[in-house]
A protein has these predicted regions:
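N-terminal active-site segment of His-dependent metallophosphoesterases
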Residues: 2-96, 103-110, 175-179
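Beta-strand-turn-beta hairpins that frame and shape the catalytic cleft
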Residues: 11-15, 132-142
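Active-site neighborhood of phospho(di)ester-bond hydrolases with catalytic His/Asp-centered motifs
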Residues: 17-19, 39-44, 95-100, 126-130, ...
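Active-site environment of divalent metal-dependent phosphoester hydrolases
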Residues: 23-28, 46-51, 101-111, 132-134, ...
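Short amphipathic alpha-helices and their capping/turn segments at secondary-structure boundaries
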Residues: 26-34, 82-88, 127-136, 192-206
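A structural motif corresponding to the C-terminal end of an alpha-helix
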Residues: 86-93, 121-125, 195-207, 241-251
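Conserved beta-sheet core of the metallophosphoesterase superfamily
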Residues: 93-96, 116, 215-252
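Active-site-proximal loop/helix segment associated with metal-binding centers of metalloenzymes
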Residues: 141-209, 214-230
């Protein structure tokens, strides 16, 4: 991505984007062989509840740990923390947003708190959820950005609630641990998009990078699934006009 520095000298910011690593299943070694300035982790990297249930006080991520002596979820939590440590060393800046799987088996907003706390341990790892980070005069803004469920279509929400695991294994932050509902994610979609709009519209003279987990266009749907209108509503939103109206958005 090209960006312009305050001294008017042109420079190029190199950004590497990865997502859906699902480290709960196996480790992935991300290298910075391209000498990128920023690594974007755009969701489905780890599960926050494993981090919460197994704090690093029970072991040190800076010492050699025999994974065979750890329980499965404790080993997974160690893997998550070691991954963040490695990418923080490999890349000058790391921008991370949660995907839907980050919330699995935990509470919705509490999971965000757990992830934010873990990222804050590293000075160059920034967790975004309706907030922003300026890197070399480029604005990074975003969050999970759930979809609008086919523009808040009731049939889409009814069907997806019974099909997707999200609405069985993610709990809301209330006393009775009720399941997350599609209408909840639609409200969060609106809130996140409103925040992105606010930041981007207030910075028309800047270069903006929007970071989210879910796709901003149905054009991203694989050819195999392009006619699955209801299910696609859980993965994509039609934000093409939003993007085209804002030329300061250089990357999404």
């Amino acid at each position: 991505m090209d960006a312009r520095a305050p001294n008017k000298q042109t420079f190029k910011m190199k950004i590497k984007v990865v997502s859906d690593l699902h480290l709960e299943f196996s480790d992935v070694n991300i290298q910075n062989n391209e000498n990128c300035d920023v690594l974007i982790l755009s969701g489905d990297i780890m599960t926050a509840e494993d981090l919460h249930d197994h704090p690093e006080t029970s072991y040190s991520m800076y010492s050699n740990v025999n994974l065979d002596n750890l329980g499965r979820r404790q080993a997974v939590a160690l893997r998550f923390r070691d991954f963040l440590k490695r990418v923080s060393f490999q890349f000058p800046h790391v921008v991370y947003v949660a995907g839907n799987h980050e919330f699995y088996h935990g509470r919705w907003d509490a999971s965000l708190t757990h992830l934010r706390e873990e990222c804050s341990k590293f000075p160059n790892v920034y967790f975004l959820e309706r907030n922003m980070k300026v890197i070399d005069d480029v604005i990074f803004v975003g969050g999970t950005l759930w979809t609008d469920m086919n523009k808040e279509d009731s049939l889409t929400m009814f069907n997806i609630r019974s099909i997707m695991n999200d609405f069985r294994v993610i709990k809301k932050d209330n006393d009775n641990w009720s399941n997350l509902k599609p209408v909840d994610t639609v409200v969060r979609h609106r809130q996140t998009l409103d925040y992105i709009r606010l930041i981007v519209d207030d910075n028309k003279d800047k270069k903006c990078v929007v970071v989210g987990h879910h796709s901003p266009s149905f054009l991203s749907a694989h050819e195999m699934y392009k006619d699955d209108t209801l299910m696609n509503g859980a993965y994509h939103s039609s934000l093409e006009e939003f993007i085209m109206d804002r030329p300061q958005i250089k990357l999404w």
